[in-house]
């Protein structure tokens, strides 16, 4: 049995405890503050980048909330083999944003109607989610193919690719490009204001203020935009009282080449879920080894896949387990899964009211851009941390250098591989897939040194320990019996060659 170590006292409320109503509600609201902005942002980004109508974008936002509520309910209640039985919160997966934009953008260039674009994107997501469900039964084998180096490269490429989307919104968005107002002083000033507010609150000593920094930054930016007359409320007119979820509202379409592209990201999301569920088990004082833990892992990943099936059918981008909430558990000392039931109900209720989804479409692009630039940059940094966490020898350097070279190269000129067959070109023209596929192939082909093989074997049995009381620097992992090397206070720096568990950080 693995052991966990905490600097502070035990949890106030353990996993199966039932806190009083008020404390349960406050705990739920605290978790919502940590995930709400990242939950609705992907739909807003995809809608803006593809020029989708306000009605469709708002529906995607509403369904994201409803699907997240359903997913959270399944995770915390653990029905048979489905769910982790932990306070695992589901939310929209940022990893799919660039893929959706690339696929939708290509279809838009071909003159395809927006509803058919949406139905294809959701159809691909629907089928791809079954990959996640199947992966829940072969987790040990999958982790040997998609190593920390591979997942780190993919996360790094995701962050770098998304920064372009963020900086476009920072300057006024795609609509400003069309109208010739891109990069105006008020756009840049508003984006910088939001950026500075987020940075300022993330420097706070209060964990709650740090976690709420993005939401506060958006509120300040929205208020200033309102005073400058930059907010258009026309989207809030003549709204129905309730949004009725309609399965496959825009139809069901499927594209095999698009499925191959999205499938790579789905496999990565499996390892994200593994890392997040492991962290949640640790802060909840549950075993992180043994049969019970393996049931939690497979159940959590199975729920991830099932919920993404449901989400895609309803009209939401794919979901995943969020890591931010582990910081909230650590901060509040409340690990009760009954808090998750409140979160689930609140999310579903919010999604049923169309005014909530429509409100987010009124946020000016520069306000969103100011938040997105720093959010996506942090995703890229998280990818770099994942890469170095497993040690960085000559072999890993070659894998990362080659993968980044091809991935970034494709982002600069996607036509470089246009001579390849259409099916292959569809995969490698996307920077994330080009970098990820290169990393997977090189990881399988390049021989490992004896020292590296020993490190990987040691990493099979890891001990996850708490490093800091800061919710934004929560965990690392080490081989059982190996000491951690730290430099002063705060999080220890990874030691080159030190074996650590495959884990994806989510910002």
Q: Which sequence ranges carry the predicted segments?
A:
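Juxtamembrane interface elements at the cytosolic ends of transmembrane helices
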Residues: 6, 39-43, 47, 193-204, ...
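Short, non-helical or kinked segments that cap or interrupt transmembrane helices
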Residues: 59-60, 81-96, 144-152, 209-216, ...
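N-terminal signal-anchor module of multipass membrane proteins
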Residues: 2-87, 95-107
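Membrane-embedded helical hairpins/re-entrant loop segments and their flanking transmembrane helices
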Residues: 21, 47-66, 70-85, 264-337
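Hydrophobic, membrane-embedded alpha-helices of multi-pass small-molecule transporters
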Residues: 22-34, 183-195, 212-213, 228, ...
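Terminal cytosolic tails of multi-pass membrane transporters
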Residues: 431-507
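Membrane-embedded alpha-helical modules
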Residues: 105-232, 342-456
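Hydrophobic transmembrane alpha-helices of multi-pass solute/ion transporters
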Residues: 2, 9-10, 14-18, 197-200, ...
């Amino acid at each position: 049995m693995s052991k966990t170590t905490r600097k502070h006292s035990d949890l106030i409320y353990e996993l199966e405890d039932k806190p009083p109503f008020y404390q349960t509600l406050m705990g739920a609201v605290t978790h919502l503050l940590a995930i709400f902005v990242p939950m609705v942002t992907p739909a807003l980004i995809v809608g803006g980048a593809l020029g989708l109508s306000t009605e469709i974008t708002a529906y995607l936002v509403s369904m994201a909330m409803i699907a997240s509520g359903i997913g959270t309910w399944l995770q915390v209640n653990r029905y048979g083999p489905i769910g982790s039985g932990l306070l695992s919160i589901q939310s929209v997966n940022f990893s799919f944003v660039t893929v959706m934009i690339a696929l939708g953008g290509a279809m838009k260039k071909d003159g395809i109607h927006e509803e058919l674009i949406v139905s294809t994107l959701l159809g691909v997501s629907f089928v791809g989610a079954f990959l996640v469900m199947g992966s829940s039964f072969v987790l040990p084998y999958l982790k040997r193919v998609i190593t920390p180096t591979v997942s780190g490269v993919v996360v790094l490429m995701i962050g770098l690719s998304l920064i372009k989307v963020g900086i476009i919104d920072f300057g006024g968005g795609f609509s400003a490009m069309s109208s010739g107002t891109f990069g105006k002083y008020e756009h840049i000033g508003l984006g910088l204001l939001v950026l500075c507010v987020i940075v300022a609150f993330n420097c706070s000593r209060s964990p709650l203020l740090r976690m709420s920094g993005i939401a506060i930054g958006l509120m300040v930016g929205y208020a200033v935009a309102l005073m400058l007359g930059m907010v258009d409320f026309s989207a809030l007119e003549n709204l129905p009282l309730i949004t009725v979820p309609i399965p496959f509202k825009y139809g069901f379409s499927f594209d095999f080449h698009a499925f191959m592209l999205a499938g790579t990201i789905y496999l990565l999301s499996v390892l994200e879920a593994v890392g997040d569920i492991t962290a949640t088990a640790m802060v909840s004082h549950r075993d992180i080894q043994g049969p019970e833990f393996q049931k939690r892992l497979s159940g959590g990943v199975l729920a991830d896949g099932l919920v993404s099936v449901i989400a895609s059918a309803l009209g939401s981008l794919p979901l995943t387990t969020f890591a931010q909430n582990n910081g909230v558990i650590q901060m509040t000392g409340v690990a009760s899964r009954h808090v998750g039931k409140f979160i689930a109900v609140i999310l579903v209720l919010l999604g049923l009211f169309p005014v909530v989804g429509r409100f987010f479409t009124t946020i000016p692009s520069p306000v969103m851009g100011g938040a997105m630039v720093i959010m996506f940059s942090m995703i890229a940094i998280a990818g770099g941390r994942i890469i170095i966490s497993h040690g960085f020898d000559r072999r890993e350097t070659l894998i990362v250098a080659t993968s980044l070279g091809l991935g970034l190269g494709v982002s600069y000129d996607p036509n470089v591989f246009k001579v390849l067959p259409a099916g292959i070109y569809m995969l490698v023209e996307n920077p994330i897939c080009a970098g990820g596929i290169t990393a997977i192939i090189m990881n399988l082909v390049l021989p490992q040194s004896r020292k590296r093989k020993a490190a990987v074997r040691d990493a099979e049995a890891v001990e996850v320990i708490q490093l800091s009381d800061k919710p934004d620097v929560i965990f690392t992992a080490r081989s059982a019996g190996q000491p951690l090397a730290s430099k002063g206070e705060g999080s220890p720096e990874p030691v080159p060659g030190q074996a650590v568990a495959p884990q994806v950080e989510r910002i």
